[in-house]
């Protein structure tokens, strides 16, 4: 009887950990402290958004150690963005637009200077559930790997990700 209870408790703990949202502290990045490089406008998309990129490149790093994550509107309740490498000036595009996030969300993208985790609230490329929360790892100029997704949950459930 006791061994069954212990087993059930262990299974509950393991299940809870598997469902837990990723946390910023689990994706550390070392902040860049050097002089910022000028932004490189090497492709057509970068040249199209040159004004927004140049303006953002003068801001302090705010994401993944050495990047400035810049966003701007692309329609009603829609944003797009890019990460500018302060060390090299290279531009890495966020590979989707974000829209339709819940009204209680004040910022559809959450990020930290000392973390590679990008938390995205809303629909990606105008597809899917607007209440979804997507978690991506930024790895050397690429938002490339979705590491977790939660749907149809209240925003209070995501406080753990903000630590």
Language model regions located:
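Bacterial N-terminal signal peptides that target proteins for export
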Residues: 1-7
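N-terminal signal peptide c-region/cleavage motif recognized by signal peptidases
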Residues: 15-17
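N-terminal secretory signal peptides
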Residues: 21-74
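Acidic, small-residue rich beta-repeat scaffolds with periodic aromatic anchors
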Residues: 21-35, 39, 111-163
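Structural signature of eukaryotic scaffold interfaces centered on beta-propeller domains
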Residues: 56-62, 107-114
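Beta-propeller domains
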Residues: 72-91
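Short, surface-exposed coil-to-beta transition loops
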Residues: 76-81, 102-106, 129-132
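Short coil/turn segments at the loop-to-beta-strand junctions that recur within blades
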Residues: 97-102, 151-154
